Amino acid sequence: MLEVILNTPAQLSLPLYLPDDETFASFYPGENASLLAAVNNALYQEHGSYIYFWSREGGGRSHLLHAACAELSRQERAVGYVPLDKRAYFVPDVLEGMEQLALVCIDNIESIAGDEAWEMAVFNLYNRIQETGRALLLITGDRPPRQLNIRLPDLASRLDWGQIYKLQPLSDDEKGEALQLRARLRGFELPEDVSRFLLKRLDREMRTLFMTLDQLDHASITAQRKLTIPFVKEILGL
């Protein structure tokens, strides 16, 4: 797991553990090559910038944020990742001082719509980042900025500035290729017929498919058997 430290002016350190297999190498772009290129390019610009991208839940937006964090963390550059769907574990003050980081990732911003304290905290962070010109700010949501139902007008308008992308969903063929890519990165082969079988018999949401792939990898190692359709049926009870 990737550990990300958020350093605030109060010297508060919050370790966040992100999946170490969610990197750019494991991100299957599909029709999202332009978004992937925009994020990669922005990571190495000398001045700060802002990118917003959105997708339905499970569409890969958190994966892309985790990958960006991992990329800069390997270079020992300071990054921050704030999953707003888990804001019950934070307070808005956690955003204080984050403009000094190289990268700030705010995930699931739709979660704070109507929360006055959090909306103001994100708005103030956005302005500080613009003033310092240092950090790359990546924000994700489940819909376009104008449809977020953000009540603070100034924040709603700021979110609609900059580069905005829709993270396009993968086709079934692309999902199969994404599964095979993840398998290769883990050191095993996922036969194409097994990949097609999984897509036919399981929920096609990528998070579910990747969790199933992890389960099959473990079962294959334990039983010392290759992945075949009969073996997969046995393990998954299908």
Curated annotation (Swiss-Prot):
<dbReference type="InterPro" id="IPR020591">
    <property type="entry name" value="Chromosome_initiator_DnaA-like"/>
</dbReference>
<dbReference type="InterPro" id="IPR027417">
    <property type="entry name" value="P-loop_NTPase"/>
</dbReference>
<dbReference type="GO" id="GO:0032297">
    <property type="term" value="P:negative regulation of DNA-templated DNA replication initiation"/>
</dbReference>
<comment type="function">
    <text>Mediates the interaction of DNA replication initiator protein DnaA with DNA polymerase subunit beta sliding clamp (dnaN). Stimulates hydrolysis of ATP-DnaA to ADP-DnaA, rendering DnaA inactive for reinitiation, a process called regulatory inhibition of DnaA or RIDA.</text>
</comment>
<protein>
    <recommendedName>
        <fullName>DnaA regulatory inactivator Hda</fullName>
    </recommendedName>
</protein>
<comment type="similarity">
    <text>Belongs to the DnaA family. HdA subfamily.</text>
</comment>
<keyword id="KW-0235">DNA replication</keyword>
<dbReference type="InterPro" id="IPR013317">
    <property type="entry name" value="DnaA_dom"/>
</dbReference>
<dbReference type="InterPro" id="IPR017788">
    <property type="entry name" value="Hda"/>
</dbReference>
<dbReference type="Pfam" id="PF22688">
    <property type="entry name" value="Hda_lid"/>
</dbReference>
<keyword id="KW-0236">DNA replication inhibitor</keyword>
<comment type="subunit">
    <text>The active form seems to be an ADP-bound monomer. Forms the RIDA complex (regulatory inactivation of DnaA) of ATP-DnaA, ADP-Hda and the DNA-loaded beta sliding clamp (dnaN).</text>
</comment>
<dbReference type="GO" id="GO:0006270">
    <property type="term" value="P:DNA replication initiation"/>
</dbReference>
<dbReference type="InterPro" id="IPR022864">
    <property type="entry name" value="Hda_Enterobact"/>
</dbReference>
<dbReference type="InterPro" id="IPR055199">
    <property type="entry name" value="Hda_lid"/>
</dbReference>
<dbReference type="Pfam" id="PF00308">
    <property type="entry name" value="Bac_DnaA"/>
</dbReference>
